[in-house]
Amino acid sequence: MNNTLKKISLFICASLIFTSCDSVDFGDTNENPNGPTAAVTSQLLTQAQKTVSSIGTNLSGILFTQQLAEGQYPGESRYAVLTYNYNSYFTGPIQNLNEIIKLNQGAETMAQAEAFGNNNNQIAVAKIIRAYILQFMTDRWGALPWTEAFQGIDNPQPKFDSQQDIYMIMFAEVEEALALINSGAGPSGDVIFGGDMAKWELFANSLKMTMALRISDADPALAKTKFEQVISSGNFISSNADNILFNYGSDD
């Protein structure tokens, strides 16, 4: 009797095993219709702009001077800011901007990316914002890993570039962006200028002037050259109407 039960049990188990090995086409049952299959450059740009908008509005200085006070988390009020670092910029907006540039330059992805604006204009805006972030970072932390950065496991310890080299990289970044700007469609997802490339050109030139002023004591000759290049073009922000603004929500 026991042997019979064992044989029946083995037969049932074997049947289940062989049945489970059948190749069954379940169609799109396991495909998420809401899951994106590729990064969308317009969304990457919006997220990068949202993150960058807080760079110039850090509250630490107000807390240092006790114009405001903290309760539950009094770190800044106690000057406990030694742990501040640039990791969130590398893994946040800069990573998004790098991806925008990559998608608009890749032979297999640029056609799809162009649905969200002219390829070169998207690259130009990404480079301008990237230079803006980079200036903030080097002014705060000095030397930064840049030329060897973003290589992942191929180079987990990239070298640090000097602040002097970083500024030269930023000037090149802005000038490359200015050369790319054209009359084509501006980028979708641009919540700052709404894809208006003329305003991005004004901002890029004004950023170049700001960078020149920042190095005027360290390298007066270079600062003078870069500043005068913009002045001679006459193409820079000269009124509040062209200011770079990030609007949170609506005005209602």
Residue map of PLM features:
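Bacterial N-terminal signal peptides that target proteins for export
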Residues: 1-9
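Conserved, well-structured interaction surfaces
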Residues: 70-189
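Membrane-proximal, proline-rich intrinsically disordered regions
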Residues: 21-84, 88-91, 95, 99, ...
